[in-house]
Amino acid sequence: MTCPRNVTPNSYAEPLAAPGGGERYNRNAGMYMQSGSDFNCGVMRGCGLAPSLSKRDEGGSPNLALNTYPSYLSQLDSWGDPKAAYRLEQPVGRPLSSCSYPPSVKEENVCCMYSAEKRAKSGPEAALYSHPLPESCLGEHEVPVPSYYRASPSYSALDKTPHCAGANEFEAPFEQRASLNPRTEHLESPQLGGKVSFPETPKSDSQTPSPNEIKTEQSLAGPKASPSESEKERAKTADSSPDTSDNEAKEEIKAENTTGNWLTAKSGRKKRCPYTKHQTLELEKEFLFNMYLTRERRLEISKTINLTDRQVKIWFQNRRMKLKKMNRENRIRELTSNFNFT
């Protein structure tokens, strides 16, 4: 049950003070009242207007019940006065908890109250720090405000209007911070200059070498010349190496020509048959089994001996022609051997 803020506490107390105090509806349309006899819990207990009425106190007048709790009404009066205290506006999702406490206890929903001495001290100190103070920097007797709105000491003028502070108080800290920024820039610039100047001094020392270093450099220059000479010699040998390799290749070719090779004849010309010994042996074996190959068998042979299908086909054609020629010659020999010419 929520209570509207614009309704005064006297309007809630009227139905209780009237002879028909048990009526359930208030004259104000925005408020629904329940009698204390229905429930043990108090009417408007959240707002702190009327306490719970036990069955023993039903006979008594409700005015006595209101008088026995003067702290509630006095606290409402203090809240209503904008000059006495300042209350921060909470977001919509977090309504104010209306439970009241004795005046000695401070609530978290109320802005921290600063004394005049602390305000005078915190004013100039706030200008020195651009970031808000953490929670550990707050005073011992000050209660922190919820994290959405942190009461900064620079805006602690609470005894003026409900808008925290005037325009002059807002302008003063910003002007002081702006005046401090150029100081920090001036302080940082000489530091940067000093940092840049440090590496310059070793450079000047390194640029002026000692006589001992000069001697060592001259001594090192001598050995450096020797590698260059060795590189030249290597380049000469590299230039002559192609000639030697060509000569070796020619000699190898001559040796092969004298003995003969499978692909080259003794005279050095290339043989007509491009097949190796292994390939010809495999083809001869297959030719003994079958002179004519099917396409599937031809593909299998070509894969086994690493030849194309066309090469195997041509070889078998040539082999058949060779066999035909041999048969003809043999036939002629047989015929001529039978006849003896006198």
Swiss-Prot record:
An individual GO BP term: negative regulation of cold-induced thermogenesis
Locations listed in the record:
Nucleus
Name this protein carries in UniProt: Homeobox protein Hox-C10
| Key words of the record | Developmental protein, DNA-binding, Homeobox, Isopeptide bond, Nucleus, Phosphoprotein, Transcription, Transcription regulation, Ubl conjugation
- Matches recorded under InterPro entries: HD, HD_metazoa, Homeobox_CS, Homeodomain-like_sf, HXA10/ABDB-like
Lineage top rank: taxon: Eukaryota
Kindly give the CDD domains that the UniProt entry links to this protein.
homeodomain
Q: Does the record carry Nucleotide-binding as a key word? A: no
UniProt cross-link Glycyl lysine isopeptide (Lys-Gly) (interchain with G-Cter in SUMO2), position: K106, K195, K254
What function is annotated for this protein? Sequence-specific transcription factor which is part of a developmental regulatory system that provides cells with specific positional identities on the anterior-posterior axis.
GO CC annotations, alphabetized: nuclear body
UniProt xrefs under SUPFAM superfamilies: Homeodomain-like (SSF46689)
Q: Where is this region: Disordered?
A: 1-20, 186-271
Composition bias of kind Polar residues appears in 1-11, 204-219
One GO molecular-function entry: DNA-binding transcription activator activity, RNA polymerase II-specific
Where on the chain is Phosphothreonine found, per UniProt?
T8
Source organism of the structure? Mus musculus (Mouse)
Q: Which residues carry this modification: Phosphoserine?
A: S189
DNA-binding region at which residues? 268-327
Regarding protein family, the annotation reads: Belongs to the Abd-B homeobox family.
Q: Which SMART domains match?
A: HOX
